[in-house]
């Protein structure tokens, strides 16, 4: 918002802020001085009023205390009943005290004006009597409300002494009505009031009777003021009050203070009026200064306004660069006007040069456009022919790639056949080796079977021996049995053994016969196996011969396939070289075509730039023509 203000308005705003700040500081400083002055005057006034009122209270109480002392001194000299009655009835005492009385050491009580006392009343037990005797001199009681008159009273008492002995205590009841009137007469021009307070904070006399006998902490619960010299502040019913305490000196047995309470708002009311007056005066002064300053700024800014109108005429009017400002002073505005004239003169020369350059630029742009159009046509023709060559080379490359692909397929199939022939040859060779090994193993088996047949013959011979031994054993066992039978009972055990031996021999003979039968069968099988092995060996040799002939044929086929594969690889290699050459030509043609396209695009960009240049040249010519040079 400040940026949109005029320069004169900014100056006026800044000046108003300075003036306002100056008046504000002056008002605050004056307010500070006035506050201090009012506070000092108020403190001096309260101190003086407190001292005067305290002195008046002291004098008022002192005169009455003096009457009590004089009465005690008179009674000390003569305390006969007649003297006591006459003395207590003196007008000076009856007009001053509500009651004057004497309590004697023997319990006799005399009071004037006379008033009936309760039965058994003993003055020696009363506080005023005890306090006076204990103090040994003049005493004052705390204020209390009289039961008969409902007035606030105090008692002044002093002992009656003769020859160092206490004869009794004389006292007088004082109404505080006069003292209340003295204190209540202080209204401080309606700003406050005074009240009497004891040293322990109990209020003794107060304009508001409801506050009497209350403590300061009860009246001011939030921030209770301390009873001391000086000034303090406290809140009462939502208002701040200034409190000052002045001690009442010369009072026996009691400590009393005169408290002065002032409403702070009323005490500083003059300061509030001064603030209002100062603010009003400051506002009036500021308005007057701003009006005068506005007129002065308007007068001083006149040359600047003329310069602004001239610049607006150049910027928004006919653009007359032949106009100059009239410089009539050598101040800042004169220097600014002279600089403006120099600037316009320089712009004038520059615009004339720009006008000539704009015409030349238009002609040059026309020549560039014509040349670019011609180059564009040639580039189109070159692009068409390049595309034709590229298409032919692409067809040649496709044919070469087809030949190379077919040659590669043939070479691949020949390689597969060669590999398969090699595999077959290896299989045949493995078969020949296996059949040779089989023939050798058959021959070995025939030899083993022949050896086995020979050993079975040997086993038959051994079995014949075993059979002979079994027969002999059987005969021996039979003979042994016969001999045992002859021996009778003595040969029974031997007969059993012989019989068992004969059984074993018989069983051995049967087993030998079975083995003989099995060996004969084994010999028959061995002879048949030898015949079969011999026939298998003959067939195996024939198979080996046939496999050798098949291996030789496969070797011949493998050599022929290898030759065909070599030819196919040569054709594929030549075709791949031809394809690489075709691809290289194709890439070159493509690069040429790309470069040609880029050239066409550059020519088109040049044409667009030339068109834009021609447009800008026309615009520049229009702008130059808008100035009057």
Curated annotation (Swiss-Prot):
SMART domains listed in its UniProt record? HAMP (SM00304), MA (SM00283)
What residues does the Methyl-accepting transducer domain cover? 357-593
The effect annotated for residue 144 to A is: Binds L-Trp, but not L-Ala, L-Arg, L-Thr and L-Pro. 100-fold reduction in AI-2 binding affinity
Q: Which family does it belong to?
A: Belongs to the methyl-accepting chemotaxis (MCP) protein family.
Substitution effect: residue 147 to F:
80-fold reduction in AI-2 binding affinity
Q: Domain comment?
A: The ligand binding region binds directly to 17 L-amino acids.
Sequence ranges assigned to domain Cache in this UniProt record: 36-259
- Its recorded name reads Methyl-accepting chemotaxis protein PctA
Periplasmic topological domain ranges are 32-276
Gene Ontology molecular-function annotations: amino acid binding; transmembrane signaling receptor activity
Which of UniProt's keywords are assigned here? Cell inner membrane, Cell membrane, Chemotaxis, Membrane, Methylation, Transducer, Transmembrane, Transmembrane helix
As for what it does, the entry says: Chemotactic-signal transducers respond to changes in the concentration of attractants and repellents in the environment, transduce a signal from the outside to the inside of the cell, and facilitate sensory adaptation through the variation of the level of methylation. Major receptor that responds to all naturally occurring L-amino acids, except L-Gln and L-Asp. Also involved in repellent responses to trichloroethylene (TCE), chloroform and methylthiocyanate. Also mediates chemotaxis to histamine, but does not bind histamine.
UniProt keyword annotation of Transmembrane present: yes
Which sites bind L-tryptophan? 121, 126-128, 144-147, 173
The HAMP domain extends over: 298-352
- TM ranges are 11-31, 277-297
* One GO location term (cellular component): plasma membrane
């Amino acid at each position: 918002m400040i940026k949109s203000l005029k320069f004169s308005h900014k100056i006026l705003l800044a000046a108003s802020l300075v003036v306002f700040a100056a008046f504000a500081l002056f008002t605050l400083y004056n307010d500070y001085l006035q506050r201090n002055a009012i506070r000092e005057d108020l403190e001096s006034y309260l101190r003086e009023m407190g001292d005067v009122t305290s002195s008046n209270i002291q004098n008022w109480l002192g005169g009455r205390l003096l009457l009590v002392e004089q009465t005690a001194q008179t009674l000390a000299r003569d305390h006969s009943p007649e003297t006591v009655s006459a003395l207590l009835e003196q007008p000076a005492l009856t007009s001053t005290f509500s009651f004057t009385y004497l309590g004697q050491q023997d319990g006799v009580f005399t009071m004037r004006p006379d008033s009936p006392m309760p039965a058994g009343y003993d003055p020696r037990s009363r506080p005023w009597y005890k306090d006076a005797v204990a103090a040994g001199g003049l005493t004052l009681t705390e204020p209390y409300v009289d039961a008969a008159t409902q007035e606030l009273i105090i008692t002044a008492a002093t002992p009656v002494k003769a020859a160092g002995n206490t004869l009794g205590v004389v006292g007088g009841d004082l109404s505080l009505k006069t003292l209340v009137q003295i204190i209540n007469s202080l209204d401080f021009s309606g700003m406050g009031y005074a009240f009497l307070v004891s040293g322990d904070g109990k209020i003794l006399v107060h304009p508001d009777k409801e506050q009497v006998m209350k403590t300061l902490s009860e009246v001011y619960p939030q921030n209770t003021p301390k009873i001391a010299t000086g000034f303090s502040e406290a809140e009462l019913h939502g208002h701040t009050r200034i409190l000052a305490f002045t001690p009442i000196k010369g009072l026996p047995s009691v400590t009393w203070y005169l408290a002065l309470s002032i409403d702070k708002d009323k005490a500083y009311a003059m300061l509030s009026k001064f603030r209002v007056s100062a603010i009003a005066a400051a506002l009036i002064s500021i308005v007057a200064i701003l009006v005068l300053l506005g007129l002065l700024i308007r007068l001083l800014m006149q040359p600047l306004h003329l310069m602004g109108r001239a610049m607006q005429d150049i910027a928004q009017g006919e653009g007359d660069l032949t106009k100059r400002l009239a410089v009539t002073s050598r101040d800042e505005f004169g220097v600014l006007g002279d600089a403006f004239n120099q600037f316009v003169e320089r712009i004038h020369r520059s615009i004339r040069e720009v006008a000539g350059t704009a015409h030349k630029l238009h002609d040059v742009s026309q020549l560039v456009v014509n040349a670019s159009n011609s180059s564009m046509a040639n580039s189109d023709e070159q692009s068409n022919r390049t595309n034709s060559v590229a298409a032919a080379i692409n067809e040649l490359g496709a044919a070469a790639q087809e030949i190379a692909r077919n040659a590669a397929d043939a070479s691949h199939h020949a390689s597969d056949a060669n590999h398969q022939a090699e595999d077959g040859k290896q299989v045949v060779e493995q078969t020949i080796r296996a059949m040779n090994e089989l023939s050798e193993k058959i021959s070995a088996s025939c030899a083993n079977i022949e050896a086995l047949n020979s050993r079975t013959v040997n086993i038959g011979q051994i079995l014949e021996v075993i059979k002979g031994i079994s027969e002999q054993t059987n005969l021996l066992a039979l003979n042994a049995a016969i001999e045992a039978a002859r021996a009778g009972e003595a040969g029974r055990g031997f007969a059993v053994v012989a019989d068992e031996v004969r059984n074993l021999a018989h069983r051995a003979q049967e087993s030998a016969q079975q083995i003989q039968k099995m060996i004969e069968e084994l010999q028959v099988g061995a002879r048949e196996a030898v015949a079969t092995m011999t026939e298998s060996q003959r067939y195996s040799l024939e198979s080996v011969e046939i496999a050798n002939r098949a291996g030789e044929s496969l070797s011949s086929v493998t050599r022929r396939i290898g030759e065909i594969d070599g030819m196919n690889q040569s054709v594929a290699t030549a075709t791949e070289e031809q394809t690489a050459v075709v691809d290289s030509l194709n890439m070159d043609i493509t690069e040429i075509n790309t470069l040609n396209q880029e050239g066409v695009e550059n020519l088109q960009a040049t044409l667009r730039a030339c068109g834009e240049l021609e447009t800008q040249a026309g615009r520049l010519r229009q702008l130059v023509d808008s100035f009057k040079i």
